[in-house]
Design a protein with these regions (language model features):
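Conserved alpha-helical scaffold segments that buttress catalytic/binding sites
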Residues: 3-245, 249-352
Length: 352
């Protein structure tokens, strides 16, 4: 179980999918035809699609089910329909219940307040967690997401644009991957997504020319291909348990191009999940070790590489002798920089 067993869940009610989608013969997705969650045999599913905003969610479905889903016939996916009660508590409660069943929920048309409520409920059940936010502006982070952060071990901000930030919006708990750093090399995002429990994708992070339905109409931001790539990285994350996708404006594009992009983002998230090769990083016998000694410092950093997936980690120094060292995700480039005695700041944070 992911969460404390004493936590009591109120099973949510759904508005089942329209027959327009449920009658589709060309998709491996199972469609919910029940209003009560307890009428479903949920344990057999791996991924659940959930509509939070019913109008947006059905627009998304029109595009998603037009894509080639044959790639996912080996996966167990269910479209639960649209939630009846979209209060912050009920949405977060639904996500936590599905996560307890080891089902990854993908929420369409969600809000940051839902994400915040999930953080609060994780803290209530004493669950350490790591969250990620894809957004152009860190000021969108709700104050509650930063408060009560004893159990929020790490918070990653991805795609942030420097010119939109104020100095007080950069909180010490947040690890930032600026848009410019992400664009230098796409794989820079991989350590940020590897250990994330849940991610919120703010569609305002996508530039207006690629996504005209954003609320901000920002001329700069992620390209559409980058948005899909980020979702694929989240899907392939070893610990990813939930994906929230924000709401958007519907009147900007009668052709449905915006909804098609969101459908593609979800498609690549599912592909990432299907293709991932989970590495049991706690079992070092399955990893190749590389020892790097920093000259004139006495510092030794142990790196590990999985020969299965090519993923890299470095070993956090022992703090408590009663516990084994923690392996922190990193990139091959960070390993090479360390070998050349140019230790990245992100690694130095763990050594100091």
């Amino acid at each position: 179980m992911y969460f404390c067993e004493k936590y009591s869940y109120m099973l949510p009610e759904f508005l089942p999918c329209s027959s327009l989608f449920a009658d589709s013969k060309c998709t491996p997705v199972h469609f919910n035809k029940h209003e009560k969650m307890h009428d479903l045999e949920l344990q057999k599913y791996e991924i659940a699609l959930i509509g939070v905003n019913p109008i947006l969610s059905d627009l998304f479905r029109h595009k998603f089910y037009s894509l080639s889903l044959d790639h996912f016939r080996m996966l167990s996916i269910i479209d639960l329909g649209n939630l009846k009660d979209v209060s912050d508590f009920n949405v977060a409660n639904t996500v936590m219940h599905l996560m307890d069943l080891k089902i990854i929920p993908i929420l369409i048309g969600s809000s940051l307040s839902h994400f915040t409520q999930m953080h609060l409920q994780c803290s209530q059940v004493l669950m350490p967690h790591r969250f990620a936010l894809v957004s152009d502006n860190m000021s969108r982070i709700d104050d509650l997401l930063i408060s009560h952060s004893m159990f929020l071990k790490e918070f990653y901000s991805i795609g942030v644009q420097r010119h939109l930030q104020t100095s007080d919006s950069i909180h010490s708990i947040s690890k930032i991957l600026y848009l410019s750093e992400f664009r230098k090399k796409l794989s820079n995002i991989e350590p940020f997504t590897r250990n994330v429990d849940a991610a919120f994708f703010d569609l305002n992070a996508i530039r207006h020319s690629d996504f005209s339905a954003s609320y901000n109409s920002n001329p700069s931001g992620l390209f559409s291909e980058e948005a899909s790539s980020i979702c694929k990285y989240f899907g392939s994350g070893d610990k990813t348990k939930a994906l929230f996708i924000s709401s958007w404006k519907t009147e900007q594009d009668a052709s449905g191009t915006n909804e098609l992009l969101i459908a593609q983002m979800v498609w690549y998230f599912i592909e990432g999940y299907g293709l991932k090769k989970t590495d049991h990083s706690n079992h070092k016998k399955n990893l190749t070790q590389y020892i790097v000694e920093i000259k004139n410092t006495g510092i030794q950093i142990n790196f590990y590489k999985s020969e299965i997936s090519g993923k890299w980690w470095f070993e956090e120094p022992i703090i408590d002798m009663d516990h084994s060292n923690v392996l922190i995700p990193c990139t091959y480039d960070e390993y090479l920089n360390t070998v050349q005695e140019q230790v990245p700041d992100r690694i130095l944070e763990y050594l100091n």
